[in-house]
Amino acid sequence: MAMNIRKIHPLLKIMNQTLIDLPAPSNISIWWNFGSLLGLCLVIQIVTGLFLAMHYTADITMAFSSVTHICRDVNYGWLIRNIHANGASLFFVCIYFHIARGLYYGSYLYKETWNIGVILLFLLMATAFVGYVLPWGQMSFWGATVITNLLSAFPYIGDTLVQWIWGGFSVDNATLTRFFAFHFLLPFLITALMIIHILFLHETGSNNPMGLNSDMDKISFHPYFIYKDALGFLSLLILLGILALFLPNLLGDTENFIPANPLVTPPHIKPEWYFLFAYAILRSIPNKLGGVLALLFSILILMLVPFLHTSKQRSSTFRPLTQVFFWILVANMLVLTWIGGQPVEQPFILIGQIASISYFSLFLIAIPLAGWWENKILGLN
């Protein structure tokens, strides 16, 4: 009997081992859907982005007009743009759920997979930031000015670094051109890293809600998880359709409908909603360099999580105290997101400072202590 071609063909064999005959734990829940949803988001963003790039002009005199032209004159240009803009929001929703799943169920103990995931988050944030500058509206321009100017806080090299990124002495045409180049390039770098992320994951196999070894209880990825992922795909596409068709500007900033004007500062400069938690941490520290470092460590702290794991159990499923701290962390993130969108005045300054201290304390002190205490209670030392 002839061997199935998908099992012997050099290229199809790799696809088969990744998507068809992959042994997967039988008990993984819906929280394991977000990895494949991130892949779908990436494909949607690359395809819509490619079509937008065909009509976009990276020049400060024409960028805003070219986006208007896409929405008014290009066939279904309005739809492509709305899908691309709201697809970015859903990308971040999926990645935040994906990270939260990893934190809750102890997936971070696969260190290589986890660290590449953190690098992917950095790249995704960089891509979204440079992409937000491209329409060249008021918030695009001032957001780019404020965020890039933070680099000047670094001693000695700061000012030179900022001018190097700007390509001059202010955010200008050179800045827009290079940001467009970066925005085009980075998604392909993300794709490459995503493949490496999956490669490392398949070295160890997937984690599961129990946090136990599931080698004795695995099922093939196809058809079981293909259908389960298909349900997630359908749900995401319906949500994206509702956003793009009915509420396209819900998550955007109205300031960005005004063309960029270096002489008029918007009343409140703020990034897109998915950066607000980090922006709140940045603003909560009065010192410029301190704020920049806090902003950086708000993401880099994820790389420390595997080393701060003190519990003898991997997952939080049977650890009630850790669960409490996890949900406090989630609530804390939501508070930071809210504060990031508020003006810099009392009581928002104080709430932001308390939430920022809580954010780092939960990662560095509360959750490791909870793990240690649970070991004591259960006599697992």
Curated annotation (Swiss-Prot):
Where is a ubiquinone bound in this sequence? H202
Per UniProt, heme b b562 binds at H84, H183
Q: Name one GO cellular component term.
A: respiratory chain complex III
CDD domains in the record: cytochrome_b_C, Cytochrome_b_N
GO MF annotations for this entry? Answer: metal ion binding; ubiquinol-cytochrome-c reductase activity
Using the record, list the residue span of the signal peptide; answer none if the entry has no such feature.
Answer: none
Which keywords does the record carry?
Electron transport, Heme, Iron, Membrane, Metal-binding, Mitochondrion, Mitochondrion inner membrane, Respiratory chain, Transmembrane, Transmembrane helix, Transport, Ubiquinone
Q: Where are the transmembrane segments?
A: 34-54, 78-99, 114-134, 179-199, 227-247, 289-309, 321-341, 348-368
Q: Which cofactor does the UniProt annotation name?
A: heme b
Instruction: Report the protein name in the record.
Output: Cytochrome b
Organism annotation: Carcharodon carcharias (Great white shark)
